Amino acid sequence: ELDGVLTKLNAIRTQAIGIIELSETLEIDIVTDIFVRINSKGTTLNQGDFVMSKIAADEVHGGNTLRKIIDYFSHLAIEPTYYHYLVSHDKEFCNKPEGYIKKLEWLKDDKETVYDPKCDDIIRVAFMHQFHRAKLAELVKMLSGRDFDTREFKEEIIEDTYNKLYKGVAEFINEHNFKQFVIAIKSAGFISNKLINSNMAIDFAYALYLILHESKEVSVSEIKRIVQRWYVLSVLTGRYSSSPESAFAKDLRQISEVGVVK
């Protein structure tokens, strides 16, 4: 009986494993859809996960490091004590001359739980802030170098996309930005994460905060008031509960065209 079990176990080495080969001519939308569908039977994945997978595999443009910054921030926001493990186990990341670990260090003492963003939240906010776009499928195309006007793929677009995404993530994880945004949300009455029932609404609120902070369109105190009002109204009306990316895109377009104050 044991021999039979060992024979079957040994036979695993010669078993054919299902492999799906995708043509390089496929549109990125189709590849994204296949990625999400294949994984739908296990842990539910989304386009944010596909973006993370794509940047993690791109060492040429520093995508692998960007993935770590996003992943580590998300982890530390929930478990601050992870910082000590990170410092002792990922020396390569911690010794980066850019000093990324210093930008995450403040999280080791963070006890705030109102907004604990996941990886896809960070990607989405950074993308909306820097590109004034909302659909992550478009980000995937841009990371591949897609020129939306000529429909060609260009290296300079990949480089520009990574530069902007790095900047967007840096603004997201900035201690001052993050803490001031959380203060604004708490001042609006949302003092516990139990009261945060819409991740999409708070993601857009943070993107709006960063956009206004960068544009200097209004004063710092006015930024908080606008963000508070926008967040409360979006929650009460359920603005981002259905087809959030379409609603994001519409709002970002209007903000770009006429501003927020008007």
Question: Could you tell me what each predicted segment is?
Answer:
Residues E1-T25, D29-T32, I38-K41, L45-G48:
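Glycine- and hydrophobic-rich flexible loops that cap the catalytic core of alpha/beta enzyme folds
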Residues D3, N10, I70-D71, T81-H84:
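Active-site-proximal loop/hinge segments that shape catalytic or ion-binding/gating pockets
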Residues T32-F35, V60, S242:
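Surface-exposed beta-strand edges and their flanking turn/coil or helix-capping segments
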Residues T44-E59, L195:
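A generic structural motif
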Residues D49-V51, H89, F93-V261:
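A cross-family structural signal marking well-folded subdomains
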Residues M52-T81, L233-R239, Q254-S256:
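Short, conserved secondary-structure transition motifs
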